[in-house]
């Protein structure tokens, strides 16, 4: 990962680039602090649809918000009767008919911030599956709000600044209380994109003990951090979450991954009105003649700064976004109009596709105006082309629903002339998928549920998988292999260790390969290849739709490619906060059970078993146990 392996949403680099970085911005990458050492630990349980036995068995008719929230709440009470908790206000019914409700454990009125419980309620009103990381140890008897012997929030911010070497200036710092209990905004701070925040919360530490901490939020542009710093010492950092997971349009059309696969063409009104009711160049309030709309706002960002509204973007009163570009053009800024247009097109097209597959307003998608359809608005994606804060990479920041996502696309310097990452669709799709997986896992209001090592690795793998599935060609077969980032990096074989392949000779990676890996992109490459096996098993059964969007019958994609993508997306919403690969496998199986009544159980199990995630595979913090066994009742 670029920046000393610190950006949770970064694309990941070829080894040559890691060894010889060419240009970086001010940020943690230039410091000695390694955020990987502060990742939250992996502790969630997942009870899949086969294992779960509903203690709340009543069916409700009609299926109302009140009924499914009550059903989920009663389950939590039954499972952990002594726990206190609150309902997170991001529950919704997915496009597959399964309702998702999230809970946060509390103690003395304060959140236990990494103690989450997600409940999935089936269409029949019964519990479908659930997962949780609730704390089951002893809650401290003393209420910290009574004695109030913890450090103040300013001390917590200073401690965070010192521990992580953030270079924030605090000479004029002051606090402003918010409506939430022991929650503050900081004023008079420089060196951050927005005012830092602090909230008093508990955190379950890796050793299983409970610590009173200040959760300090600092957006320093290249990293958007939640730091859990001990509220008693004001110095000890117990965990860190990074939200960064670093008309007529003349473009490389959807399905063309990079300039080696086809020419640019002019495409008219490419939006899907069912997914983008305001088109791509309106936000419901204003109509634009530039690369700005409800789903995203694209611009040049040569300085790498955080301001974007006044940055340059092409403007076309007649809506003809047609600008010159050639592979030999130099310098990159000479074709910035084409770069911005391409980035805007790819991101919007992906928004529309994800919408049809279930990533809509209620699920936490990225839109300025949600048009009365639920969820929190005001969160289009900020799309920075030729961002000056780095090279040879890309990243995506995913705050909770209601705050804009931020994508940075860089220039790649491994070729002459240099190459612009915005012209490799797979990179854009990979980055946007960080927003998808972070919003769905643990619920739209919780963006820290892919922060553990294995879950963070799957976050990278989902990006590679979606990018690869989208670039499939009409003549591809089960034996077709694909690479990642090959064009931008100018590296034959791409930026992953092996191509994505169904051949164990071409790609030998299995679940137990993770025992030798401790970096999220390497872990992600294993997960992406498991999903590549799943993709082709479903295509071999159902065929492949080579069109730009799926066709449905009774809510189910009729082909294997889009069905695989749908099941992967639905699985994200079912799985617990910070899942491991075994739990994510179970969530995909459950997604198929919810969508098709398990019609693809055999194909799914065969894909996972081939890569060591068969029946009996186990996750342990120190090692993984593999299995190639397909359950006897699966096929």
UniProtKB/Swiss-Prot annotation:
Keywords: Glycoprotein, Hydrolase, Metal-binding, Metalloprotease, Protease, Secreted, Signal, Virulence, Zinc, Zymogen. The active site is at residue 431. Glycans are attached at residue 287. Residues 290-309 have a biased composition (Polar residues). Zn(2+) binds at residues 430, 434. Its EC number is 3.4.24.-. Residues 20-246 form a propeptide. InterPro entries: FTP_domain (IPR011096), Fungal_virulence_M36 (IPR050371), Peptidase_M36 (IPR001842), Peptidase_M4/M1_CTD_sf (IPR027268). It is found in: Secreted. Gene3D superfamilies: 3.10.170.10, Neutral Protease Domain 2 (1.10.390.10). Its main location: secreted. GO terms for cellular component: extracellular region. Coiled coil: none annotated. GO terms for biological process: proteolysis. Residues 1-19 form the signal peptide. Secreted metalloproteinase that allows assimilation of proteinaceous substrates. This is Extracellular metalloproteinase mep. It comes from Aspergillus flavus (strain ATCC 200026 / FGSC A1120 / IAM 13836 / NRRL 3357 / JCM 12722 / SRRC 167). The gene is mep.
